[in-house]
Amino acid sequence: MTGGKSAGGKAGTTKNAQSRSSKAGLAFPVGRVHRLLRKGNYAQRVGAGAPVYLAAVLEYLAAEILELAGNAARDNKKTRIIPRHLQLAIRNDEELNKLLGHVTIAQGGVLPNIHQNLLPKKTAKTAGGKPASQEL
């Protein structure tokens, strides 16, 4: 009997390794999310589908925020997204603002807002361009 590895095993095991992220069509790492779920003591056991679903949700949220932040950067004629653009994107979107309402973004600033009572009053003019009469 010769030593070494036998040639037995399953037939046709020449498949290339494929990550769970690529199987799911995701850019976010499913394996890392699974490891963090296991080490985080959220539950005794973690199902196989849970990290895939969570990675997909995180990828969607990141894509949504980056899309809106990119639009904010383009509106400000910039090509690089800065924290200010993230702040504007999140605070101008109703659902993201609700989700991240208590989150502070460093160097994000605040939304420009002037209270209606502080704005100058509109003067009422007639169609002829003359000021409205004070007569009753």
UniProtKB/Swiss-Prot annotation:
Residues the record lists as N6-acetyllysine modifications: K5, K10
N5-methylglutamine PTM sites in chain numbering: Q107
InterPro entries recorded: Histone-fold, Histone_H2A, Histone_H2A/H2B/H3, Histone_H2A_C, Histone_H2A_CS
Matching SMART domains: H2A (SM00414)
Site (Not ubiquitinated): K121
Post-translational modification: Phosphorylated to form H2AS128ph (gamma-H2A) in response to DNA double-strand breaks (DSBs) generated by exogenous genotoxic agents and by stalled replication forks. Phosphorylation is dependent on the DNA damage checkpoint kinases MEC1/ATR and TEL1/ATM, spreads on either side of a detected DSB site and may mark the surrounding chromatin for recruitment of proteins required for DNA damage signaling and repair. Gamma-H2A is removed from the DNA prior to the strand invasion-primer extension step of the repair process and subsequently dephosphorylated.
Residues found modified as Phosphoserine: S133
Gene Ontology MF terms in the entry: DNA binding; protein heterodimerization activity; structural constituent of chromatin
Compartments it resides in: Nucleus; Chromosome
Keywords: Acetylation, Chromosome, DNA damage, DNA repair, DNA-binding, Methylation, Nucleosome core, Nucleus, Phosphoprotein
Region of interest (Disordered), residue spans: 1-23
Segments of skewed composition (Gly residues): 1-11
Family in the record: Belongs to the histone H2A family.
Subunit structure: The nucleosome is a histone octamer containing two molecules each of H2A, H2B, H3 and H4 assembled in one H3-H4 heterotetramer and two H2A-H2B heterodimers. The octamer wraps approximately 147 bp of DNA.
UniProt remark on domains: The [ST]-Q motif constitutes a recognition sequence for kinases from the PI3/PI4-kinase family.
Protein name in the entry: Histone H2A
Species in which this protein is naturally found: Botryotinia fuckeliana (strain B05.10) (Noble rot fungus)
